[in-house]
Amino acid sequence: MDKHLSPGFASYHAQRILATPNVVTITEVALGIITLYLLGSYIVRRNSLPPGPRGLPIVGNVRDLPTERPWLFWAKHKDIYGPISSITVMGQSFIIVNELQIAIDLLDKKSAIYSDRPRLEFAGEMIGWNRQMILSQYGERFRTMRKFVKEFIGTKAAVVQYRPLQEIETRYFLARVLATPEHLADHLRLTAGAIFLRMSHGYAIDTEKPDALVNLVETAAKEFYIATSPGAWLVDQFPALQKLPNWFPGTHFKKVAAEFFEHNMEQADRPHEFVKRRMNAGTALPSFTSRMLERGLDEKDDEVVRWAANSLYGGGTDTVVASLSAFFLTMVLYPEVQKKAQKEIDTVIGTDRLPTLDDRSRLPYIEAVLKEVLRWHPIGPMGIPHRVTEDDVYNGYLIPKGAIVLPNLWMFAHDPSQYHNADEFKPERYLETDGNVPELDPHALAFGFGRRACPGQELADTNMFLTIAMSLAVFNISKAVDEKGREIEPVNEFSSGTVSHPKPYKCKVTPRSASAEELIRLVGDDHMNRPTDANDL
């Protein structure tokens, strides 16, 4: 055969070689290279993340997720992996932050890329909580909503005008507690609802019987915690499940979502339309909603105001209730703190009047009690998750675009490098005395970070101060007793929701003296005969 092969023969010979099973084709080589590249990229990416437990193939760390008290679960990561760690579940990266300075470095200093929220299919898309500020995606709509709320209550100067409302409603709270102390939790909710609904919509609650709007807000809040429970809803991992027909097995979540959606829309729509009717009739009281609507907003901004107002009373009410419930619990658990606080009030204010916000600067121990309530058990112990919108690198670790960042506020508040004997309730830690350097003010961590920090913290802070100071001025708070006169130890546990409330506990609330009871009764008759807007809702 001629050693110089013709082109046709060479082509035929090459085809035979490529058709041989044992010969690797160019396509196979390319696929192998691509596979190795992707696998290598994944390994490098995984190794570049903050340290964390090794996951399973495909599902990752699905077995490493907590079912309750996540703040304690994630706090253990700090001992094992350090102050920043990570897990990956179904391809989704989670970054757990257990040190305050890291949270500040990321969520405050780099808030431009750390201010988004994760997309929650069940709570956000199906129930509509992504319309409210708490789960709204970061963008123009969120910025407008936050701007409106901050303008209304975002500064000390802005909240001064609401002092009379806060003080009178707190006095009404004292009267209700005096009448039925066994319903303390209900009185806390009613008072918070009265303040925030008056501010958000100019709405006067019903004090004679359970108020329909207050109940609706509370129902929606409870459903929010159910809807946002981590890992509870498979549709969050597999959004395509929404498209299954309602009769298909396993789609009960669609019925639940429809019910929750109705309650969520109703709690936003009913008070908003109430204000519009009152404005048309010329009888609307000044409020956040009426002030915004007077600007003649277009349909787009009208919708923003509707949900900004919902954020104002919905978010504000529940967080204040949780904090004040924790306050009453600590007074039962730490009676020596209560005695010191009462002594300060008696010395500075006397016993013939109630403390007011004007007295705040003269009551440093009461101020310290408030701070310790915020620290001892942060009512949002895991904060609200942030989502990073760009790849970032922190201390050599990759935080990939789309990662969900979980700031462990509880760990920040129990960091032994910041707070000694952190599990103890010790207001003295904030006082500057001989030999004592004040520890970190928990306001630095309790209200969130960056552009997602709570815009209503000034208002919440003044509400808490008034309730704490006035309650200690006139009430003794102690352990409840059973029918045989034996003291009942209060339950010292907290729920695992986004807002963490003390679990139901019993306590005894009694007037400190006859003169204290008289101070309470000065407003008692007035609050029982107040007009209500409940019938016009």
Swiss-Prot record:
Catalytic activity entry: (2E)-geranylhydroquinone + reduced [NADPH--hemoprotein reductase] + O2 = wigandol + oxidized [NADPH--hemoprotein reductase] + 2 H2O + H(+)
Organism from which the protein derives: Ampulloclitocybe clavipes (Club foot)
Summary of the function given for this chain in its UniProt record: Cytochrome P450 monooxygenase; part of the gene cluster that mediates the biosynthesis of clavilactone A, a meroterpenoid that features a unique benzo-fused ten-membered carbocyclic ring unit with an alpha,beta-epoxy-gamma-lactone moiety, forming an intriguing 10/5/3 tricyclic nested skeleton. ClaR, ClaS and ClaT are sufficient to produce clavilactone A. ClaR acts as a macrocyclase to catalyze the oxidative cyclization of the isopentenyl to the nonterpenoid moieties to form the benzo-fused macrocycle, leading to wigantol.
EC number, as in UniProt: 1.-.-.-
The protein's required cofactors: heme
SUPFAM superfamilies: Cytochrome P450
Protein name: Cytochrome P450 monooxygenase claR
Residue intervals passing through the bilayer: 23-43
Gene name as annotated: claR
Gene Ontology cellular component terms for the protein in this record: membrane
Compartments in which it is found: Membrane
Lineage: Eukaryota, Fungi, Dikarya, Basidiomycota, Agaricomycotina
Gene Ontology MF terms: heme binding; iron ion binding; monooxygenase activity; oxidoreductase activity, acting on paired donors, with incorporation or reduction of molecular oxygen
Family annotation (PANTHER family): P450, PUTATIVE (EUROFUNG)-RELATED, P450, PUTATIVE (EUROFUNG)-RELATED-RELATED
